[in-house]
């Protein structure tokens, strides 16, 4: 009986582990992105989950693979800012503020 209870508790703990929307450290508030070139954005999310990115009024979408990795390319933009970069999944969102476009 104890084994069954222990197994059930372990099962619940393992399946409650939450996969997070993760971004590399290069994506942060106050970052500067290269102007005039496509901009790759990537990270990790729940496997096979859609990731939505919004920047300067344009929306982009990518689907995480079976390991949770995703990547998309945003259009090239001219210099300017500050802007907001929003990255969302069904469960979570990240907002990067004061994003500038310029020469890196």
Task: Go through each PLM region and give its residues.
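Hydrophobic h-region of N-terminal signal peptides that target proteins for export
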Residues: 9-18
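Non-catalytic, glycine-rich low-complexity segments
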Residues: 18-47, 99-104
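Positively charged n-region of N-terminal signal peptides that target proteins for export
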Residues: 1-4
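Extended acidic/polar, glycine-enriched regions
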Residues: 42-104
């Amino acid at each position: 009986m104890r084994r069954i209870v222990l197994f059930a508790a372990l099962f619940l703990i393992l399946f409650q582990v939450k996969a997070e929307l993760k971004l590399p450290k290069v994506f942060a508030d106050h970052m500067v992105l290269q102007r005039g070139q496509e901009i790759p954005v990537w990270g990790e999310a729940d496997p096979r989950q859609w990731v939505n990115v919004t920047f300067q009024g344009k929306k982009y979408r990518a689907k995480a693979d079976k390991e949770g990795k995703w990547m998309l390319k945003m259009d090239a933009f001219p210099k300017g800012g500050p802007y907001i970069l929003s990255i969302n999944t069904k469960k979570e969102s990240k907002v990067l503020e004061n994003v500038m476009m310029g020469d890196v």
